[in-house]
């Protein structure tokens, strides 16, 4: 079964590009352009890798990440940060890298491979996995 990639990206054009790239490479990929939609997608099916835009409106990027790592089976899901701030992955547990526009498809796919190799599905969770409720939609 192909690995599942969740793209959480405010810009629908960027989200569509990333999903298309990942699907063409043989992955199962879906996108959410808003935090609440991303929460629903994780609740429905655990992703193997998340590409996360930290600059979502209403601080949904950090809120989504903080919530996701508390969900059963999601504590070690690797995250690639879509941000202008190189090196930010050093401050975010489970982050395996950052990407910025313009996107290099070879780099994007290499980050997916690295994430999957580093965090094999089924790896025990290290963060608290108490199953925190979904963040408030406000």
Curated annotation (Swiss-Prot):
Q: Which PROSITE patterns match?
A: RESPONSE_REGULATORY
Q: What Pfam families does this protein map onto? A: Response_reg
Q: Which GO biological process annotations does it have?
A: phosphorelay signal transduction system
Which residues in this protein are found as 4-aspartylphosphate? 13, 53
Q: Which UniProt keywords apply?
A: Phosphoprotein, Transcription, Transcription regulation, Two-component regulatory system
Function field: May be involved in regulation of gene transcription. Belongs to the family of response regulators, and members of this family involved in the regulation of gene transcription are two-domain proteins. This protein contains only the N-terminal phosphorylation domain and not the C-terminal DNA-binding domain but it may bind to Rrf2 protein and the latter may bind to DNA.
| The protein's name in its UniProt record | Protein Rrf1
Name the gene that codes for it: rrf1
């Amino acid at each position: 079964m192909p690995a599942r990639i969740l793209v959480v990206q405010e810009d629908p054009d960027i989200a569509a590009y990333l999903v298309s790239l990942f699907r063409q490479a043989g992955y199962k990929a879906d996108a959410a352009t808003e935090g609440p939609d991303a929460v629903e997608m994780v609740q429905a099916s655990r992703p193997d890798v998340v590409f996360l835009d930290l600059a979502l409106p209403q601080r949904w990027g950090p809120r989504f990440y903080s919530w996701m790592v508390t969900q059963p089976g999601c504590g070690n899901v690797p995250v690639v940060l879509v941000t202008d701030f190189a090196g930010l992955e050093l401050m975010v547990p489970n982050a395996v890298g950052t990407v910025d526009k313009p996107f290099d498809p070879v780099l994007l796919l290499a980050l997916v491979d690295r994430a999957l190799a580093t965090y094999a599905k089924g790896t025990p969770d290290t963060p608290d996995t108490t199953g925190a409720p979904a963040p408030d939609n406000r």
